[in-house]
């Protein structure tokens, strides 16, 4: 078997094979066909952004808890999105190299890392202090320098870094907060 896209990874490596299977069996069937996105999923190592207790699940088609305890995870609902959802978001956002991006809900920093490869700069906001630090550490370890991680509540706090070309909410809301809409550049 040879790996498609622009990877030089060894296909006999179990992690590389798991990543390949994730792309072929979860992401492509979800109509994510943008080769730049597929290449990026080979380059940004998802497993490095998953909490150590869940690394074995890094490529599974599921949301991965980001909180240390199941009780805290249920209370806060903090999780990594399923890989197919992350890939579809990345494809549909059509981020350009000149874009400034705001992400609400940093989590582990993985989505910010993906966005950073496509954008000029990413500002990511996280409400949970431990996850702010986790995202910062992960992004630093991955060598990603064009992301600013801030602690705050995207629905309530003032965000001084706008305007933005793209705003991503890595969670659910009943209604898009007006303060976020005000930060979106015209045409964004």
Placement of each model-derived feature along the sequence:
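Conserved nucleotide-cofactor-binding alpha/beta core module
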Residues: 90-188
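Short, composition-biased local secondary-structure segments
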Residues: 1-2, 107
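Class I SAM-dependent transferase core
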Residues: 2-102, 118, 131-141
């Amino acid at each position: 078997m040879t790996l498609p896209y622009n990877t030089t990874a060894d296909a006999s490596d179990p992690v590389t094979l798991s990543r390949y299977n994730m792309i072929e069996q979860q992401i492509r069937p979800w109509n994510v066909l943008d080769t730049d996105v597929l290449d990026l999923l080979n380059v940004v190592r998802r497993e490095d952004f998953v909490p150590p207790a869940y690394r074995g699940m890094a490529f599974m088609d599921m949301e991965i808890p980001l909180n240390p305890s199941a009780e805290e995870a249920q209370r806060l609902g903090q999780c990594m999105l399923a890989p197919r959802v992350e890939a579809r978001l990345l494809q549909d956002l059509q981020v350009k190299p000149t874009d400034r991006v705001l992400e609400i809900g940093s989590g582990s920093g993985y989505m910010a890392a993906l966005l950073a490869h496509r954008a000029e700069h990413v500002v990511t906001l996280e409400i949970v202090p431990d996850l702010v630090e986790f995202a910062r550490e992960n992004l630093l370890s991955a060598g990603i320098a064009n992301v600013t991680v801030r602690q705050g509540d995207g629905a309530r706090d003032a965000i001084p870094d706008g305007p933005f070309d793209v705003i991503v909410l890595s969670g659910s809301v009943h209604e898009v907060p007006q303060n976020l809409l005000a930060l979106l550049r015209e045409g964004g």
